[in-house]
Amino acid sequence: PDGSTRKIRSLQIPQSNWQDESPISLACSDIDGVNTYRISINNRHTMGIGRLRLSSAAVKDNWEAEAGWTLRSLIRGQHPEQAKEAFIDPARIIDLSDAMDTKGNLSWNAPEGNWTILRIGHVNTGMKNGPAPAEGTGWECDKFSSEGADAQFAGYIGRLIGPNGPLYGGMLDGMLMDSWECKTQTWTANMEQEFEQLAGYPLRQWLPAIFGYVVKDHETTTRFLRDWRATISSLATEKFFGGMAHNAHANGLTLAFETAFGDILPGDILEYYKYADVPMCEFWRHPSDTFVGSINFKPIKPTASAARLYGILVGNFA
């Protein structure tokens, strides 16, 4: 009202990846007495803003990346000062799964008060492999299950090297999985059991945090989301990359694969390369002054570090 201004927050936008199509949520401390906001962006290159939404709700900073919906650098530092009343009390979360019928109709006598109902389900990612000929194109397999790896191997390499395949009899000695271009995955059929086995506590009570809500407090939510991303990393590593390595070696093939973790999918890039006979990355140099193709655009250095860690050769596809 008196015409004065004050800075609410200043930060560097997290580094993202080339398949990131998710919004970015930035949290700030509670503020009062403000009716006009000014948002300034200093960017090296031209950048368009599709939509800007201001909200009074408490959300986790950059939760889209924290929850594994996309891969970005994570924001660390002091948590915003927000009223605890805006956080979700875990003790007040009610599981209504048994109150919903098979058609998705909810029958529930809600206690007095204001309630937010989260209807959570899962479908496939909507991604298909490519580039590929029409007869070789289909839905991406489940990367968090051994069955997914087995199905992908059997449907492609297995046909080539099988008794009726054109490469039967030892004609093929290796296989390469190219760059990961199927965005991210966040669920599998037995995700709750897998999470509890790896993290040591039930998942369901914390599901709201995967959608940006602050459960209990910022620090506790951050710790849960760390366990969540670790589960995603472990499942993709052991079920898919480990499964593909098992299938390859069982058929006398060496396995090379390019980056997924540190490129598109959140995960431990040093961990999953243990299943590569040849860890690979890719690089190119764009003719214009752009981040695309630069040394940090692809995780080249972590790939080389993984090769040194496991004492194996590193490959490059350029």
Predicted regions and their residues:
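Phenylalanine-focused residue identity feature
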Residues: 87, 144, 153, 195, ...
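Extended amphipathic secondary-structure runs
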Residues: 101-108, 118-121, 239-255
